[in-house]
Structures are given as C-alpha cells and as structure tokens.
Amino acid sequence: EQIARGRHIANSFCASCHSTTNELPLTGGLDLGKDFPMPLGTFVSANLTPAGPLKDWSDGEIFRAIRNGIDRDGNVLFAMAGARGRNLSDADIEAVIAYLRSQPAVVNDTPLPLDQYGPLALILVGAGMIPEPEPPTDAAIAMPAKGATAEFGAYILSYQDCVLCHGADLTGGEPGQLAPVGPSLAVVRGWTMEQFITTLRTGVDPSGHALNNQLMPWQNIGRMDDDELAATYAYLTGLPSLVAQQPK
C-alpha cells in the first residue's frame, strides 16, 4: 500500500519534471531551465530510478532533498528548493521513497552537476534578484483525512506547483516570474465539478480550449483520483481570493 501511494504521487506529480515523457519511470533528463523566461542555465532533472545517483543515498538524504531541496553534500538543488514538494506529508514522502527504491533500474545518464548556472543567473543571485529558497525545516507535516473536501484540497494545492504559475493566491501569475505566467483560476468557479475533472483528464476546457501540457501539466495532474480532483475543486471554488473575482 505504501509503494502504491508513492507510485501514485510520482505519476501525478514528480513525473512532470523527472521524466521527458511525463510518465513513469522517473528517468530524469528534462532541462527545466528551458521553461524560464530568461537564460539562467541548465537545470536537468535527476534520474530517480536505482540506476541513478539515489542508489547511493540514504532514505534520510532523499527525504531532506524533497523536504528542503538540499542534496546529500549540503548543496542547494535549484529546482527542488523552489518546488512545492516540500509540503508533502512525512508519510507521503516516505511513500515516494519506498516507490523510488522499488522502481526498475533504467539507465539514463544525465550531466553532472545537474544544476549549471549561467552568467546571468550568477549575476542575479549575487544581486539578490532570485528569490531565496525557504529555510530548511525539520517540522513534521501530517496529511488530513483523504476525501472530497476543501481541507484535503488545500493539502493537494500545498504540494502541487499551481502557485508557481498561477500566483500565490491563484489569481494569476506576474510578468517576470520564473515559471510560466498562468491565468487566474477564478474561471474554475464557473465550471461544474464534472467539467473541472474532465478538463484535467482530457486537456480540453469547457470552452473547447486545449491546454498546453508543457505550460500546464494536466496529463500528470489528471492522474489524481476522483476524490483528489473533487477536493481540489472544492478548495478552489471556496478560496476567498477567487470568490472575490468574477469567473472570466
């Protein structure tokens, strides 16, 4: 059951970065730097199968990388430090680790170091113009009871990377942010729950607009089960910042 839970999270979350096909296995090789609005360097996702570097890491070191974006040598992992996976519950991170250990080893050599900062990135870091990662934490995180509730939806939104594109309050991203600028999610309040789930399962919204998976990873998010998607809908439709906006 733990491995199955970890596989589910890997398939609906981790694979959007750690796979060039958006699918399992998590062989890495995707240059996340190509999605940035400016040339900051190359930031290649690691091969997370037992053929990759994690075979030499302890479970605790993998846990720290997910929770705090720090590798076994104490170096900051640029993409992981800014990602939301740090908000996965302790039990869910342990489930992901159990799944990672269970994967078949698939060879996919990736460049080392994975993070290679370009000149512009070094200038921006030196000038304090790239946001600092959140400070490391060892605080425990518990997952609320699973169900089609806004509370469980809040947990899902805490670790899915929606805010990176759609803004801290999900009312729309800001020009100049590192992630693609996403629109306000107030539009969801004009959809039924069935339309919301269908959009994330098919990549086509109720107006017939096709979502670009490179900008909006609906293929991965749509692999969440019905309760998870219903919980996400319940959370979004009741979020005060979105209630204050009219659906467009």
Region spans (language model):
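Periplasmic/extracellular electron-transfer cofactor-ligation site
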Residues: 11-42, 68-75, 103-107, 158-181, ...
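Acidic (E/D-rich), amphipathic helical modules within compact regulatory domains
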Residues: 16-26, 98-123, 152
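Electrostatic cytochrome c docking/interface patches
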Residues: 1-10, 25, 122, 126-158
